[in-house]
Amino acid sequence: MKPPAACTGDALDVVAPCSAVNHLRWDLSAQQIAELTTELIEQTKRVYDCVGAQEPQDVSYENTLKALADVEVSYTVQRNILDFPQHVSPSKDIRTASTEADKKLSEFDVEMSMRQDVYQRIVWLQEKVQKDSLRPEASRYLERLIKLGRRNGLHLPEETQEKIKSIKKKLSLLCIDFNKNLNEDTTFLPFTREELGGLPEDFLNSLEKTEDEKLKVTLKYPHYFPLLKKCHVPETRRKVEEAFNCRCKEENCAILRELVRLRAQKSRLLGFSTHADYVLEMNMAKTSQVVATFLDELAQKLKPLGEQERAVILELKRAECEQRGLAFDGRINAWDMRYYMNQVEETRYRVDQNLLKEYFPMQVVTRGLLGIYQELLGLSFQLEEGAAVWHEDVALYAVRDAASGKLIGKFYLDLYPREGKYGHAACFGLQPGCLRKDGSRQIAIAAMVANFTKPTPDAPSLLQHDEVETYFHEFGHVMHQLCSQAEFAMFSGTHVERDFVEAPSQMLENWVWEAEPLLRMSQHYRTGSSIPQELLDKLIKSRQANTGLFNLRQIVLAKVDQALHTQTAADPAKEYARLCQEILGVPATPGTNMPATFGHLAGGYDAQYYGYLWSEVYSADMFHTRFKQEGVLSGKVGMDYRSCILRPGGSEDASVMLKLFLGRDPKQDAFLLSKGLQVEGCEPPAC
């Protein structure tokens, strides 16, 4: 396929000189965090006061739009220094101080977003300035500020504005508390070795012990997922699954009810019928009806596949109960799902996950992953020895453009769990790559935070294949942050439409299902041998194992999210239980409240969880149309991808970027085929 002409340009901003400074620091005490928070608020407010005091005739690009853009750059960096430690600091005092800083700064963010005087100056500027006199991205920035002002109700009566401001402040604090509760949860369950039957020795040996010599199983991912997949004792799985979905049940249940109520109230004040419609106005989908149709149609297509998969699982369960002398209850329980889905992979596809992970030691995976990304995107990574970091496990890398040697950014890797740390895997943008006040380009800096199994004195960290996939995905977000060359902080990195933001990373997950990349990031941890070809072939074929059930569960989560944000009276636990039964065909465990543990609902994905599936339409199309056709390790396609999809950040609409990269409008064919569904006139290898 001939590459789109628009993708052939330079992937770097060659005009602006680059400032190589890392402005981040991680040595602040709790007291310093508190003091600097107050200082940052005062400094930033002074700029807003200055903009808000301009007379109509004096308003200009320099004293209004550029002043706001410049303060956004410095404020974003300083804010991240103060509020990021709540997720990663080994010190509880620092985490607490950082959380308090986040609360104060979130309240301040609301105050600044509701500055009617500043909004009026932006409106005056728009009326005054000739649109073609602004650079395209500056014009987009101006339009975005006007749009955000209206979405904050700054065109409405003052009384309404005050109500909206009050609600926004409450929402910020509730979201922080919701996720803090989950991060700080230290629940563990004690079990005997017999109760943990089926789990490998390296897992059992890594567990801490209680005073009576029982093994401590926490509810963090490195314990929860392996246990649900491998433990053959149903009662143990039941206890752990139930505890996992009861985390922070009382406190987060109350927070979630209040979040939903306040979001609906705010959206009505702004003239939207539901919170979902308010949120989706800024996304590719635009309305809740479009999302509902997308999810309903996909569910209908996947349900027959889900029924077939449930029948297979039920038969596996019946046979195992007979073999182990256990009573067969004739149904699939929530705590059975991951266990038997894993068995499907091991029996139907003959993929032995315990054997497979021996080929994925962390150091080898990291070396291979970094090598692939460097080759694919024309980059060069270098470890910075002795860098200032927040914990000894953390590493910092410098990233350069391979062709020019120009520094474009840095990234931190924080890959292992510890108490009080953020419990999932995520990329945090810490220093936006954009233009500074003096016109120089600020390098982008991001952190990948994960919770992979930590090495012990006896064994290295060995990754499950799905953890390798997670690693690839989150590192894709890091690359999006670093390769973006936007002028404004507001459009830097992953600041794209929320239902597109996952697409660049999802597309890069495909590399962990292709033979050549897999061989490059694997090696047996003892013998150094490559994955046997037979095991590799089985792994690749297993990609569509359980695809019906897995994606139906994603639809359940997306529909719960939509229901809560379109029907304010919906009870979260009841709605989740209803959808589990109706769509997945597997009941939720009685007494649990999964939505109270669903961090996305309070983490910026409200009414937007559907975006994971929606984004996959584009990620599948990009991969199959370009990389699969022209070479999965093609540096040429990789550079087109970097130029068309990563370079713009949010300075272009996603639909424009996609059309440039694909050479046409996106299609659903590759997405549907990737789910194991038939597409008329389309064969899987060709689409």
UniProtKB/Swiss-Prot annotation:
Q: Name one Pfam family in it.
A: Peptidase_M3
Query: What sort of enzyme, by top EC class, is this?
Result: hydrolase
List Phosphotyrosine occurrences by residue: Y278
Q: Which UniProt keywords apply?
A: Acetylation, Cytoplasm, Hydrolase, Metal-binding, Metalloprotease, Phosphoprotein, Protease, Zinc
Which parts of the sequence bind Zn(2+)?
H473, H477, H480
List where in the cell it is found: Cytoplasm
Q: Which organism is it from?
A: Bos taurus
Describe the subunit structure. Monomer.
How is the co-factor bound, per the entry? Answer: Binds 1 zinc ion per subunit.
User: What InterPro entries would the database entry show?
Assistant: MetalloPept_cat_dom_sf (IPR024079), Neurolysin/TOP_dom2 (IPR024077), Neurolysin/TOP_N (IPR024080), Pept_M3A_M3B (IPR045090), Pept_M3A_M3B_dom (IPR001567)
This protein is called Thimet oligopeptidase
